[in-house]
């Protein structure tokens, strides 16, 4: 009987330790910096608009951040000769398109969000046309901080096949 009690106690201790380990860490990612919060906010918004559940693709995120760094001055304005949209042929009818988010009412001016504005936003609504919904095969959001504002770019892979 003593051996049985001891065995049950050891098993119970093992189960409790396992439960504690699975409850700690390894859970969902919680953004900590304002840049990460902006990326998570817009990733959720675009997944909702597209009706998808894409993860933030690391290669596309890197491309989005590179486009932001290459296109924006330190004050968040566009550099001479740069535009709000970057696209490249990735081969096999697949294109990579990066769009810098624009200010409402002016598609040629990058939208910079402050930390205070970001803290007050829990949801963003974006509109996506049907063609984008039908052709998007990958998604990522990249953000960079310039001055006191965060600028966001959306990177997508699109499969454009002619029938």
Where is each model-derived feature located?
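Short, well-ordered surface patches within globular domains
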Residues: 29-94, 135-137
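Bacterial Sec-dependent N-terminal signal peptides
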Residues: 1-11
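Residue-level signal for functionally critical sites in structured catalytic/ligand-binding pockets
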Residues: 1-2, 50, 61, 125, ...
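Short, conserved catalytic or interaction motifs in soluble domains
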Residues: 26
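C-terminal motif of bacterial Sec signal peptides marking the signal peptidase cleavage site
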Residues: 19-23
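A well-ordered secondary-structure block
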Residues: 88-163
């Amino acid at each position: 009987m003593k051996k049985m009690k001891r065995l049950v106690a050891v098993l119970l201790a093992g189960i409790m330790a396992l439960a504690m380990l699975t409850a700690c860490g390894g859970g969902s990612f919680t953004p900590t910096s304002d840049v990460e919060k902006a990326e998570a906010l817009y990733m959720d918004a675009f997944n909702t608009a597209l009706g998808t559940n894409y993860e933030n693709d690391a290669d596309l995120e890197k491309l989005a951040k590179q486009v932001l760094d290459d296109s924006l001055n330190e004050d968040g304005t566009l550099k001479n000769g740069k535009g709000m949209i970057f696209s490249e042929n990735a081969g096999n009818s697949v294109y990579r398109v990066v769009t810098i988010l624009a200010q409402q009412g002016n598609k040629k001016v990058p939208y910079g969000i402050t930390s205070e504005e970001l803290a007050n936003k829990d949801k963003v609504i974006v509109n996506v046309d049907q063609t984008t919904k039908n052709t998007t095969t990958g998604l990522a959001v990249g953000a960079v901080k310039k001055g006191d504002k965060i600028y966001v770019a959306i990177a997508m892979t699109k499969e454009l096949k002619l029938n």
